[in-house]
């Protein structure tokens, strides 16, 4: 599935934790999503997915979440966008 990255950012909190997010639109989807990434070591990542602009259909959100769980390339593309935005 093709995705359009709208914006991304990454920052460190307390010199330990990483927090970042990527706002994106997936091909064929009406909604714009934001995925927030969190890591304590910069290697193992948790995420939270939500709608960006306004609430949408819960089924649509669950389908996107399942897609992210099963499509490593898409997940990594979104994470890489956030990591690339981290100031060196």
Predicted regions and their residues:
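Short, charged/polar N-terminal "headpieces" of proteins
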Residues: 1-32
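Acidic, low-complexity intrinsically disordered segments
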Residues: 36-88
């Amino acid at each position: 599935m093709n995705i359009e990255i709208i914006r991304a950012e990454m920052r460190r909190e307390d010199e330990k934790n990483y927090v970042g997010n990527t706002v994106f639109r997936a091909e064929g989807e009406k909604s714009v999503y934001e995925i927030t990434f969190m890591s304590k070591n910069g290697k193992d990542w948790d995420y939270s997915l939500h709608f960006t602009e306004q609430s949408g259909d819960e089924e649509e959100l669950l389908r996107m979440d399942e897609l992210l769980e099963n499509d490593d390339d898409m997940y990594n593309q979104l994470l890489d966008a956030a990591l690339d935005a981290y100031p060196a």
